[in-house]
């Protein structure tokens, strides 16, 4: 569907690439498909835990954290498959954003922890951050200021 929207209407699409529900190999197949379809903008997310789980559990050898998925995308961009072999075609030009939480992620002990992980995501290559739904604008503006103070200089 994303390819149809992008190619027919010339609208840039940003598919969500999740840790949840996918193994590393399945993620690689998705990246290959997106590369073939010339879709290069991604939103990289861990995804939610299953309703019956008390903690997030990855699929098979899938990832626990979005930053691990970022590493796979970064390697893919360099022409390296998940098994370590090199692509015989041109490497991918994926760019991506990540999630952030102005009102604190439900699993985080505090907002400082969320800022720490956001900074790690930025250091790993995130170009922008998209907030999860929030209800208090004041907390959003405080979060943006705290992010800037922590050296996080991407659009939020």
What do the PLM-derived regions correspond to, one by one?
Residues 34, 121, 125:
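Conserved, mostly hydrophobic/aromatic
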Residues 13-25, 95-113:
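Active-site mouth loops of central-metabolism enzymes
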Residues 13-17, 42-44, 96-100, 122, ...:
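Hydrophobic faces of well-ordered beta-strands that scaffold small-molecule active sites
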